[in-house]
């Protein structure tokens, strides 16, 4: 397949709006459903990175305690040494104050960052300042250096641990939690803003909006349509999951300035990554295609079962259930990757399809379905929020932008670097096969 010339690729990019600019215009008409926002009890829960910090603070106390106990366990016995260290305390020769200093850090940091869950650095600034000043004075004035290896070891270890805690909080905990809070507030703002142009997503596709259905109405929201139909509790859960995935995909598209470049290829395809709160690292493929958006919509979104005919990264795709006009359950089997080091995986996803004025969107997330229980033949992967987005060009209807958002857990004991390499390679391979398919359809026409 011949690749796009560089000038044509640049022209395509100039003629197509950026994802973020689109997200700030018409996509704002799609208000985020309230289930995008974590429930209050989840918002109050301590974050994973803060929990790790608290564990490290606990390790600080336990490690200093262990070293002190080893120092006490000499020929004269622990009990006698404890009397000398505590009852007959001497600043110049005792290690007891270093243990008390570790307990001071432990109690202060856990009170501030585990119990009160403070978002400021002042508590650790106090504990680190007190620890550093005390240890420096003790090393200068005491006679610990005459007590052998422990005279060097305990002050140094205590000093290093105190500053490691400072680094961890300042460079890991607070920035990551601030980023999660920014995402949460952005989602809240989108919910409060409400629909500006038209409510709900329209489904006008041939496969999912029959003439007699309610999905073709411009004046009816998804909730009103659902109210006119009878859904089971499980079907309502599928619909909720699909809407949640769509809301997260909209947020990712609106955060294009925060996408981190990973790699590109000679065809102009680019892979980015972004850390999504509560879902982790997400891969994003962005490519420009010399064809109408409707063509990609038909081939990739409306006809997933036929994708196996041209997409070599997928070996099977089956629609298990059509819940309603916008929502369906699919079963997919991926081909192996990384030269066979990553074996085929199977996935059960709920998909939500929306047709908007500026784009076509198919978003999905992992779910469970009785028609496809776990099997020994494949390792069952689990997809986070993601999907396909086909962006229309406002100035040139013969070109479009294709975005694939992929958040997946392949399960199994696979090295992280191997997973990341295989996902990026799979995305490039998919883009290659998609271009081939477009060329074949163009030749037939």
Swiss-Prot record:
MENTAL domain residues: 46-217
UniProt subcellular location: Late endosome membrane
Transmembrane regions: 52-72, 95-115, 121-141, 149-169
GO biological process, any: cholesterol transport
CC terms in the record's Gene Ontology section: endoplasmic reticulum membrane; endoplasmic reticulum-endosome membrane contact site; late endosome membrane; mitochondrion; nucleoplasm
Ranges where the START domain occurs: 248-443
Extracellular face residues: 73-94, 142-148
Cytoplasmic side: 1-51, 116-120, 170-445
Phosphoserine PTM sites in chain numbering: 209, 217, 221
Catalytic activity: cholesterol(in) = cholesterol(out)
Name assigned to this protein: StAR-related lipid transfer protein 3
